[in-house]
Amino acid sequence: MQKIFSENRFKEVLDNLGIKQNDKLLVNSNTLNLMIKYRDKSLPSKMLDILIERVDSNGTLLFPTYNWEFCNGLNYDLLNTKSATGALSNLSLKKNFFIRSKNPIYSFSIYGKNKDEIAQLNHYSCFSLDSPFGYLIRNKGKNLFIDLDYKDAFTFVHVAEEDVSVSYRYHKKFTGKYIDKNKVEKIENFEMYVRKED
């Protein structure tokens, strides 16, 4: 018998996790296996609608729209570079009520009350406390994982590592062409706190 994705069940799960209106919520997800399981290509869209409704316009919803091509010398276009972090993140980028934060490596698609504030953050280092990660920490944000093991997606650990200057990582600079929301091209530098090679 074909299983059907239950929107009500998803809402119940959010209830049980304490996800509510006005929350500041970061959602990491992998919906591919769920789409296969339920044979439902519209599943990311259904989930997105429920999450938007849940946090409401007075809350703030963030999806990771990370892309590491800038680290390999490729151009970064704020409006057109795709996310490498899944269908739900890429779907959010297509919605005109979401905006994208500035960092070319660890950007976020953002909806809600504080989206402009977060999108305007200028953080040279991907994991610094003046990044969207820091915003979530300062504002008691929550992190929801959908069909992901936290060991594969808990990027916040790198924020803690940078904050305490762990000895096994260092700041590595990346330089490349950056195309901003006004289509202005410039050469920009960004840093990522990367693991030292053995």
For each feature predicted by the language model, list its residue ranges.
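N-terminal and secondary-structure boundary signal
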Residues: 1-198
